Structure formats: C-alpha cells, structure tokens
Curated annotation (Swiss-Prot):
Keyword Signal (UniProt): no
Taxonomic source organism: Enterococcus faecalis (strain ATCC 700802 / V583)
Record-given protein name: UPF0298 protein EF_2453
Family that this chain belongs to: Belongs to the UPF0298 family.
Localization per Swiss-Prot or TrEMBL: Cytoplasm
This protein's record includes keyword Cytoplasm: yes
A GO term from the CC aspect: cytoplasm
Short name of one Pfam family: DUF2129
Keywords of this entry: Cytoplasm
Superkingdom, natural source: Bacteria
Length: 116
C-alpha cells in the first residue's frame, strides 16, 4: 500500500457583499457569484459570501445587473475582534513608572438595566 499524502489545510479568506436590489424575482442570477447566506424580503437586500480574491471583479459584475440598486462590501474582516486588551484586563491599565510597570486595577462591573 502506498502512503497517502496529507495536504495541509489552509483557511480560505472570505468576505460578504451586501447587495441591495429593486426586486427579488431574478435572485437566481446572484447564485453564480457566491453563496447566498441571507435574503431580506422586507428590506430587499441579499448577503452573499465569496472568496476574497474575487470580491472586486464580482462587485463590478453584480453592480451592472439591471435589478441591483447598490453593492456594499462588508468591513467585518477589517475590524479588530480581540477586545481582551481593551476592557477589563490588567494589560489595559498598566502605567509605566521609573522602576517598571505598576498595575492599576479598576472595577469592571457590568450592570444590566433591569438591575439598576
């Protein structure tokens, strides 16, 4: 028996487009550009996921369709999602002094509106 070669898994970079449409009837035309994740019938928009390298070319093609009002790119991959250093950790409240770091601990209590 031959040993099977294992391929290393690489995470595919993906991004979503929000496509605002005039009507939802020709919705099947959008399937060729990516995975349709959500359709809002009330607000008339479609969320499509596709590979990152195809975003710019597909945005131009989708925008030229007759039933498309506008196309917006999702900025979620660009937003820093690590909030551990922002709120409630010791690293967020370090102040540098002459002899090193002094940690100033602050109370980070979250109160709900119904308990106030």
């Amino acid at each position: 028996m031959q040993a099977k070669e294992e391929k290393e898994f690489t995470l595919q970079e993906r991004r979503c487009l929000i496509v605002w449409v005039y009507t939802l009837k020709p919705l099947k035309q959008l399937r060729r550009y990516g995975l349709i994740h959500y359709v809002s019938r009330k607000m008339k928009y479609v969320v499509i996921y596709m590979n990152e390298e195809n975003i710019e070319s597909n945005m131009e093609k989708i925008n030229q369709l007759h039933f498309v009002r506008s196309v917006d790119k999702s900025y979620r991959p660009d937003v820093e999602m690590n909030f551990a250093e922002k709120i409630g950790t010791k690293a967020a409240y370090q102040e540098q002094e002459d002899d090193g770091y002094v940690v100033e601990e602050l109370s980070t209590e979250i109160r709900l509106a119904e308990n106030v």
